[in-house]
């Protein structure tokens, strides 16, 4: 009688370079075919929800940046919208346009990282180099408005921290750059931030084309992604998939279109939808989403150029007065002191607010008991639902395809483990 091969179990991660952080998976293999994939989470658990209950509403805001640390400002946006809904704060129109613009900048940042690292994991190294070149310019936008390249804390309940600056920081001369290269780098930085954004929007679609040239019709890329990790529309909805993971399966659901928030109902853009629900279709959706984000950014930039105005609410129970006023007026000083020591008091109630995060539907559920701190803060992370589909998506595929499936899910453990 022939000896039957026993299934064997291996650990994937948490030190694996394609684990996207601290993913540990126990894989049961029959030869090189996956029989079972069991993700183990919690290695990046930092107790964000509990920590937020011990901080004022403003102090809890920077924790949002650290959830999905590739899409910082969209996390902030969900939190701010939830607080504003509970408190009944009216956000100035200009602030809403700035938020929408930076949410789309963040979407491009996320997709460049997602596609670049996905290709890199599979073995196409060039894509990530091109992706990081463009991400660098968008990181400069973050730095120009907030002073930080990653954890911006730029969105605030009631608006944004400050208006767009009138200039962009320039590259300085160094022994690594000659005068010609320096001039080339600073060419788009001569004017205002909006000039820089417009120049980026003109240039970026060509850079997306370059990425597409590297990957879209690449025979090896298609062999590694077509027909891999297929999810039917029915299973995608049953599993709670959102964002590209749902649209890649052919379900046209985008919170920006179906339940518009901020200024998205005024924007003209399309929703890319996949057909086959595999890794390749999800890649194509992300590519097209970047093009649509450029369209939205252009519309915001046009409006912001001709419509000056306040960028944060004038209700000083929720947002501080300007520093110049605070230093000259007693009432303004009191408001400032109360806000930054005691914090804002949000009326009793509860709300769930969802935004179209680059990875899916990012939701924030807040219960307020009328105090200066949230009574309960629950975060609905899109990646958490996607990771639960790992077993179903990987079953029957080869060991090497696990890497492609993790990449297509675009998992970041800051939000999964919270």
UniProtKB/Swiss-Prot annotation:
Subcellular location: Cell inner membrane
EC number: 7.1.1.-
UniProt entry tagged with the keyword Transferase: no
One cellular component term from this protein's GO annotations in UniProt: plasma membrane
Keywords for this protein: Cell inner membrane, Cell membrane, Membrane, NAD, Quinone, Translocase, Transport, Ubiquinone
PROSITE patterns per the UniProt record, alphabetical: COMPLEX1_49K
Chemical reaction(s) catalysed: a quinone + NADH + 5 H(+)(in) = a quinol + NAD(+) + 4 H(+)(out)
A UniProt-annotated Pfam family: Complex1_49kDa
Similarity-based family: Belongs to the complex I 49 kDa subunit family.
HAMAP family to which the protein is assigned, alphabetical: NDH1_NuoD
UniProt function note: NDH-1 shuttles electrons from NADH, via FMN and iron-sulfur (Fe-S) centers, to quinones in the respiratory chain. The immediate electron acceptor for the enzyme in this species is believed to be ubiquinone. Couples the redox reaction to proton translocation (for every two electrons transferred, four hydrogen ions are translocated across the cytoplasmic membrane), and thus conserves the redox energy in a proton gradient.
Name of protein: NADH-quinone oxidoreductase subunit D
């Amino acid at each position: 009688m022939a000896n039957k091969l026993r299934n064997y179990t291996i650990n994937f991660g948490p030190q694996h370079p394609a684990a996207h952080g601290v993913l540990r998976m126990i894989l049961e293999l029959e030869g090189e075919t996956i029989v079972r994939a069991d993700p183990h989470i919690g290695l990046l658990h930092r107790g964000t929800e509990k920590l937020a209950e011990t901080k004022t509403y403003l102090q809890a805001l920077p924790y949002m940046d650290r959830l999905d640390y590739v899409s910082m400002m969209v996390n902030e946006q969900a939190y701010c919208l939830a607080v504003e809904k509970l408190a009944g704060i009216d956000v100035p129109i200009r602030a809403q346009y700035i938020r929408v613009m930076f949410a789309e900048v963040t979407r491009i940042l996320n997709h460049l990282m997602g596609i670049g690292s996905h290709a890199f994991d599979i073995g196409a190294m060039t894509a990530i180099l091109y992706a990081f070149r463009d991400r660098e310019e968008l990181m400069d936008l973050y730095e120009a408005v907030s002073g930080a390249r990653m954890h911006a804390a730029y969105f605030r309940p009631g608006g944004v921290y400050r208006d767009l600056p009138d200039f962009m920081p320039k590259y300085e001369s160094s022994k690594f750059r000659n005068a010609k290269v320096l001039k080339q780098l600073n060419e788009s930085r001569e004017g205002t931030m909006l000039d820089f954004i417009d120049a980026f929007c003109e240039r970026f679609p060509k850079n997306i084309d370059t990425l597409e040239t590297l990957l879209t019709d690449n025979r090896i890329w298609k062999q590694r992604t077509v027909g891999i990790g297929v999810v039917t529309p029915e299973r995608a909805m049953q599993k709670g998939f959102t964002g590209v993971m749902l649209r890649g399966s052919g379900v046209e659901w985008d919170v920006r279109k179906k339940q518009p928030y901020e200024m998205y109902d005024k924007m003209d853009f399309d929703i890319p939808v996949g057909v086959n629900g595999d890794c390749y279709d999800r890649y194509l959706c992300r590519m097209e989403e970047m093009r649509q984000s450029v369209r939205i950014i252009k519309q915001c930039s046009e409006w912001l150029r001709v419509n000056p105005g306040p960028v944060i609410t004038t209700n000083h129970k929720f947002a501080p007065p300007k520093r110049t006023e605070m230093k000259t007026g007693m009432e303004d000083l009191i408001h400032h002191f109360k806000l930054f020591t005691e914090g804002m008091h949000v009326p009793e109630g509860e709300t769930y607010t969802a935004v179209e995060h680059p990875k899916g539907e990012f939701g924030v559920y807040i219960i307020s008991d009328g105090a200066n701190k949230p009574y309960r803060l629950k975060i609905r992370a899109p990646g958490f639902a996607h990771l639960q589909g790992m077993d179903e998506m990987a079953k029957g595929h080869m060991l090497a395809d696990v890497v492609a499936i993790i990449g297509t899910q675009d998992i970041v453990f800051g939000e999964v483990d919270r």
